[in-house]
Amino acid sequence: MNQENELNINFGVDTLVILGRIDCPKVTHCRVLISKILDKISEKKMKTHFVACFETQFENLRNYLLKQDLGFIDFQDSPIIYIQETSGNKKIIGSLDEFQKYIIKEFNYHDVLKTEDFVDETKKSLIFKII
């Protein structure tokens, strides 16, 4: 299965991609949380794409998106967050608390992610780029 053809998204520095599982109960919730960030940086005119897939497609799609050099959040055992910055540097942040501090510092926005929002065993990932 060629994920590249199926995805058909024009990736660019003005693009944010959110990847969620269709069978994940928090897909909509994750999207809403990231939308809060977008609301605060809407002057940057960032395009948003939401991609949902079933678990069987999830790893392949995630690997494809990672090759696009986008920032990546993986909420599995312990969150490891990679933020692709405008400069091209990839910043590694080790927890949701650190991610929240980063957002507060960069965008002066205090109501973004609360760690308890993601306390469950469901595998889920968000992929995004902050410019």
Locate predicted features.
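Eukaryotic N-terminal low-complexity, Ser/Thr- and Lys/Arg-rich leader segments
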Residues: M1-L16, K114-I131
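Beta-strand cores of modular interaction/reader domains in eukaryotic scaffold and signaling proteins
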Residues: V17-L19, H49, I80-I83, K91-I92
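Alpha-helical interaction elements in eukaryotic regulators
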Residues: K26-C30, Q57, D77, I92-F99
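Non-catalytic, surface beta->alpha helical segment in thiol-disulfide oxidoreductase systems
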Residues: I83-V119
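Short coil/turn segments at beta-strand junctions that form active-site/ligand-binding loops
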Residues: D14, D77, G88
